[in-house]
């Protein structure tokens, strides 16, 4: 569920992944403080152990997409909003490609790019996802029915489970789903699958 980080490379220059994980850690802590809840409270809400919550906030471990999904559920926020909450500067209308936050799941190799300009107050989020061959990620129910998403496949084949249903999607296919239904994504092919996720709230 998480990858333990080595402390032997402290002197090495911070990578883009390090920056993203710091944003996530800061975002979790800030959101938790905004809600006025303790690490124990978040652990109870999300089903993630109190020890793991603390390690993630201290950047001692690299959380997987599934684990982050559970934490975001406990915080009542999407991952994109979580990352944005760690940014103190006001939002800009343009998100340059080189400046868009990119996060890699240490468990699956999934690469998630937050395309939408952050901190603009928009109720729409646009995320680009690259799912490696022979990998999958599953998300628990997010108890907020007003969140939904449209998934548009750009390249490759994507298998999406949504509740009790399974959908095989190809390039150009689009599917709508809600966050209050368990869902997951799998790439059974031999090459990466790329897709866009449009989240509305």
Give a label for each model feature:
Residues 115, 163-178:
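Short acidic-glycine-tyrosine-enriched beta hairpin
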Residues 42, 67-75, 82-83:
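Hydrophobic micro-packing sites on short alpha-helices
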Residues 110-111, 122, 170-171, 179-201:
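Ligand-binding loop in jelly-roll beta-barrel domains
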Residues 1-19, 162, 172-173, 193-196:
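N-terminal flexible/basic segments that precede or flank functional cores
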